[in-house]
């Protein structure tokens, strides 16, 4: 009797562990003809973690038009097809704004149907892999299409060199989702900007304009930014006007007071005097 109970408990534990394992993910990204990168995994839209097995993104989603958008989107856990995926299950699902829809992973359901939206717009998308739900709500920001929630600097000028396992993140501005910033030490060398931290060198990069170092282009010739002096820099990218600003940290700092201290003067080492 004890052995039977023990076996049953072990089976329950193993089943629970397998279910949790199938839902767990270190990364989640949106792929499909409803997003800018289409069906290219290296250009899928990276979602950011927002708790254990919860991911969020603000992203421009396009409605089905029968021409450029025929299917919608689904979710990948890596920038490749051979990975755990999440989709709509047995039939395509048109998401109701603010209403959670069920997620199905490709290990339990192989029908691979897609999610769709009624209107092209920026959406705040939340995927809860614990509850296996996806929710899309129209974003307050609609001025420009939002295609990324973070960017990453890569190159021998960065601390991580050309290693995609050690990218330098650029954080999205809380007030303007088209602006990304980083304060980081840069070495003498070159760099460019990735939009997918799992996409490797097959993805489309943000690159230096061939005629203007302060301008950014998306894709094209592999022109990089050159850092000529090692220092800590503030780097700001604005995708609304496709510009980049690279300046030394504290370059704008203005000193308006100096104080003399020491035993060579009357007040000695006293800060108050």
What are these regions (language model features)?
Residues 65-69, 110-124, 129-133, 223, ...:
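Short tyrosine-centred short linear motifs in exposed loops/low-complexity segments
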């Amino acid at each position: 009797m004890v052995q039977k109970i023990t076996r049953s408990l072990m089976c329950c534990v193993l089943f629970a562990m397998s279910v949790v394992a199938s839902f767990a993910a270190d990364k989640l990204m949106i792929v499909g003809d409803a997003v800018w990168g289409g069906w290219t995994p290296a250009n899928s839209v990276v979602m950011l973690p927002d708790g254990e097995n919860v991911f969020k993104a603000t992203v421009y989603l396009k409605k089905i038009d029968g021409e450029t958008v025929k299917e919608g989107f689904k979710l990948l856990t890596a920038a490749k097809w051979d990975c755990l995926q999440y989709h709509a299950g047995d039939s395509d699902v048109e998401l109701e704004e603010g209403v959670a829809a069920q997620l199905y992973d490709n290990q339990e359901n192989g029908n691979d149907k897609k999610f769709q939206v009624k209107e092209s717009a920026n959406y705040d998308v939340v995927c809860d892999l614990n509850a296996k739900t996806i929710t899309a709500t129209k974003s307050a920001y609609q001025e420009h299409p939002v295609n990324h929630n973070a960017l990453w600097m890569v190159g021998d000028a960065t601390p991580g060199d050309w290693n995609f396992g050690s990218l330098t993140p650029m954080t999205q501005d809380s007030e303007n989702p088209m602006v990304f910033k980083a304060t980081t030490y840069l070495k003498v060398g070159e760099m460019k900007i990735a939009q997918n931290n799992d996409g490797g060198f097959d993805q489309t990069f943000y690159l230096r304009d061939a005629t203007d170092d302060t301008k950014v282009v998306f894709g094209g010739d592999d022109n990089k930014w050159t850092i000529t002096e090692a220092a800590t820099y503030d780097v700001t990218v604005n995708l609304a006007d496709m510009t980049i600003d690279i300046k030394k940290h504290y370059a704008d700092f203005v000193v308006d007071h100096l104080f003399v201290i020491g035993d060579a003067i009357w007040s000695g080492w006293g800060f108050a005097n």
